[in-house]
């Protein structure tokens, strides 16, 4: 027997590094970095990072629910009318709620087989493009979309932290999971695959 070959499968997910993005002159929003580290066979890529905003999480939950009607999906953090993107406590509570949501989703084998989830986690595609890709209306497959994004973004935070611990590039400071950074729109990820599934809210 080779014990090293019998390692239990795992999927780890972090939601971190909230950043304020400018949508236009009057409007801004916060997006979050979603990082995946896994040895699961259902994922094409074993590490990835991508940026998503709250509205995209709402779309994902509706999409997953429409494809798994009998599954009780976890709740997202509620949309607070008094949410203040400059309030660190508000931002971190939402970040933690989004992370808890994804952790519970990734524990469900049926949800884990949905290609929409994998494209959400490991590609730069928006909701409309995810729907088109999953339904076979694009020139690229789910796996190709993920690989393409992986080639564009070869970075994973744990690797950075290992090599740059002294450079303050970790889970603390201003752009950490509980901090709040500012930047222009940017996405980073590395891919994963499986099967299909709705529509933007």
Swiss-Prot record:
A GO term for molecular function: 1-phosphatidylinositol binding
Region called Disordered, residue ranges: 155-201
Organism taxonomic ancestry: Eukaryota, Metazoa, Chordata, Craniata, Vertebrata
InterPro entries registered for this protein in UniProt: PX_dom, PX_dom_sf, SNX10/11
Family: Belongs to the sorting nexin family.
GO CC annotation: apical cytoplasm; centrosome; endoplasmic reticulum; extrinsic component of endosome membrane; nucleus; secretory granule
Function description: Probable phosphoinositide-binding protein involved in protein sorting and membrane trafficking in endosomes. Plays a role in cilium biogenesis through regulation of the transport and the localization of proteins to the cilium. Required for the localization to the cilium of V-ATPase subunit ATP6V1D and ATP6V0D1, and RAB8A. Involved in osteoclast differentiation and therefore bone resorption.
Keyword Cell inner membrane among record annotations: no
Domain comment, as recorded: The PX domain mediates interaction with membranes enriched in phosphatidylinositol 3-phosphate.
One Pfam family linked to the record: PX
Membrane topology type: Peripheral membrane protein
Chief place where the protein resides: cytoplasm
Record text on subunit structure and interactions: Interacts with ATP6V1D; may play a role in ciliogenesis.
One Gene Ontology term from the biological process aspect of the record: osteoclast differentiation
Tissue specificity annotation: Expressed in femur, calvariae and teeth.
Keyword line: Cilium biogenesis/degradation, Cytoplasm, Cytoskeleton, Endosome, Lipid-binding, Membrane, Protein transport, Transport
Places the protein is found: Cytoplasm; Endosome membrane; Cytoplasm, Cytoskeleton, Microtubule organizing center, Centrosome
Positions of the UniProt region annotated as Required for interaction with ATP6V1D: 8-125
Keyword Membrane applies: yes
PX domain: residues covered: 10-127
Protein name: Sorting nexin-10
Binding residues for a 1,2-diacyl-sn-glycero-3-phospho-(1D-myo-inositol-3-phosphate): 53, 79, 94
């Amino acid at each position: 027997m080779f014990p090293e070959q019998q390692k239990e499968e795992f999927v780890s997910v972090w939601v971190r590094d909230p950043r304020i993005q400018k949508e236009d002159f009057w409007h801004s929003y916060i997006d979050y970095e979603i990082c995946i580290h896994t040895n699961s066979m259902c994922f094409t890529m074993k590490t990835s990072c991508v940026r998503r905003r709250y509205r995209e999480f709402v779309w994902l939950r509706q999409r997953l629910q429409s494809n798994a009607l009998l599954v009780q999906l976890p709740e997202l953090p509620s949309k607070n009318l008094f949410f203040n993107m400059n309030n660190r406590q508000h931002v971190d509570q939402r970040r933690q709620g989004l992370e808890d949501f994804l952790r519970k989703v990734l524990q469900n084998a049926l949800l884990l087989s949905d290609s929409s989830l994998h494209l959400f986690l490991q590609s730069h595609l928006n909701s409309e493009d995810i729907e088109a890709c999953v339904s076979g209306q694009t020139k690229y497959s789910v796996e190709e979309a993920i690989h393409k994004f992986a080639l564009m973004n070869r970075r994973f935070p744990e690797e950075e932290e290992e090599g740059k611990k002294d450079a303050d590039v970790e889970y603390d400071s201003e752009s950490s999971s509980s901090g709040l950074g500012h930047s222009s729109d940017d996405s980073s990820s590395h891919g994963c695959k499986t099967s299909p599934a709705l529509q933007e809210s």
